[in-house]
Amino acid sequence: MFHNCRMEGSCNAETTSHVTAVVRAPIFCNCFALCLEIPILWDDLLYRHEKLLFGGFTCNGGAELILNSHCCLADAQMWQVHCHCSDSLSLQCLSRTQVLKEFLEEFVMGGFVNKKYLWYREFVNSSRPDEINYVGSIMFRNIHYIYFRLSFFSTVHQACMLAIQRCISPELGVVFKSTYNYWLVLKCKSCSLQNYCALKSCAFWVRSIIDRVLREVEKIPVVLHRTTSKAEERRQTALKQAMMYGRCRHIQNLCLVNLNAFLHF
């Protein structure tokens, strides 16, 4: 039903894992820090030779934020990725580490769009419920990955996930459970890194997709308040002040974690 462990899955207590790579990401990735993770769609992102090297030892948990006593939105954060092989000292695992680190360094640089186009989050989340919340974007290998965090009451969670899946084809995006949250990731192949008009068209397209998703979810029925929440306004303000003016806000005070992801709904 939902993508599970290994190349398209999530980390859990039963899965053996060890930290295999750590990278420092610029502050434009800190929108993901509020969710404690940057999910990585390995099957979509990796070249064939990279898939052969990484095998089935990665998961959609992707990059996990390394929390410390002073995690500030205005500072670059450290992120770690886990490997699920059985021997962290094996030659195969050690050889993967450097390749994986270089891949991650390239991947996180695709988050520049979150700072360059701050209006994108404000526009996409305007008059939209917190249950389907745009978090951030990654531009990587000519594809724009658009991340939405999904959070519904446990009583309707499963039905909502299925409703969203009915609206999203594999070419359009993917719905999955990661370590801390459930996610919808849309894929846009027409965005140009230097073309404002293309990104603006993308934002309208994304809102139309989310409108379709909301209509499907509301058939369950579920009451969704189509307004910009005060919590989202606080997040937008904190991110803008951090990225533009270097104002520090503690990530722990703003972070979002979906309890359903831990309870395996």
UniProtKB/Swiss-Prot annotation:
InterPro entries listed in its UniProt record: Adenovirus_E4_30/34
Thylakoid keyword on record: no
Principal cellular location given in the protein's record: host cell
The entry's keywords: Early protein, Host cytoplasm, Host nucleus
Domain of life assignment: Viruses
Entry GO terms, CC: host cell cytoplasm; host cell nucleus
Location in or out of the cell: Host nucleus; Host cytoplasm
Subunit structure: Interacts with E1B-55k.
Protein family per UniProt: Belongs to the adenoviridae E4 30 to 34 kDa protein family.
Function per UniProt: Plays a major role to prevent cellular inhibition of viral genome replication by nuclear bodies. Assembles an SCF-like E3 ubiquitin ligase complex based on the cellular proteins ELOB, ELOC, CUL5 and RBX1, in cooperation with viral E1B-55K. This viral RING-type ligase ubiquitinates cellular substrates prior to proteasomal degradation: p53/TP53, LIG4, MRE11-RAD50-NBS1 (MRN) complex, ITGA3, DAXX and BLM.
Name the UniProt record assigns to this protein: Early E4 31 kDa protein
